[in-house]
């Protein structure tokens, strides 16, 4: 995929699913099914429900995405 075929958004992890999958509630009000990126997996970054994350979505399927970055809790003031 090309760089301009992707949409970056922020959201809150609402549910942790098996196989490093997560359900994320985006800022625009949509729920998406996401998986974690390779760098997050390689660096053992733990993502828990309630964490604020940056998500990358494809313009071809807006129901699935990839978690790129976990925003630290001190910087995040949002709650479920």
UniProtKB/Swiss-Prot annotation:
Keywords: Chloroplast, Initiation factor, Plastid, Protein biosynthesis, RNA-binding, rRNA-binding. Residues 1-72 form the S1-like domain. Its main location: plastid. GO terms for cellular component: chloroplast; cytosol. Gene3D superfamilies: Nucleic acid-binding proteins (2.40.50.140). Coiled coil: none annotated. It is found in: Plastid, Chloroplast. It comes from the Eukaryota. GO terms for molecular function: ribosome binding; rRNA binding; translation initiation factor activity. HAMAP family: IF_1. One of the essential components for the initiation of protein synthesis. Stabilizes the binding of IF-2 and IF-3 on the 30S subunit to which N-formylmethionyl-tRNA(fMet) subsequently binds. Helps modulate mRNA selection, yielding the 30S pre-initiation complex (PIC). Upon addition of the 50S ribosomal subunit IF-1, IF-2 and IF-3 are released leaving the mature 70S translation initiation complex. NCBIfam families: infA. Belongs to the IF-1 family. Component of the 30S ribosomal translation pre-initiation complex which assembles on the 30S ribosome in the order IF-2 and IF-3, IF-1 and N-formylmethionyl-tRNA(fMet); mRNA recruitment can occur at any time during PIC assembly. This is Translation initiation factor IF-1, chloroplastic. It comes from Psilotum nudum. The lineage of its organism: Eukaryota, Viridiplantae, Streptophyta, Embryophyta, Tracheophyta.
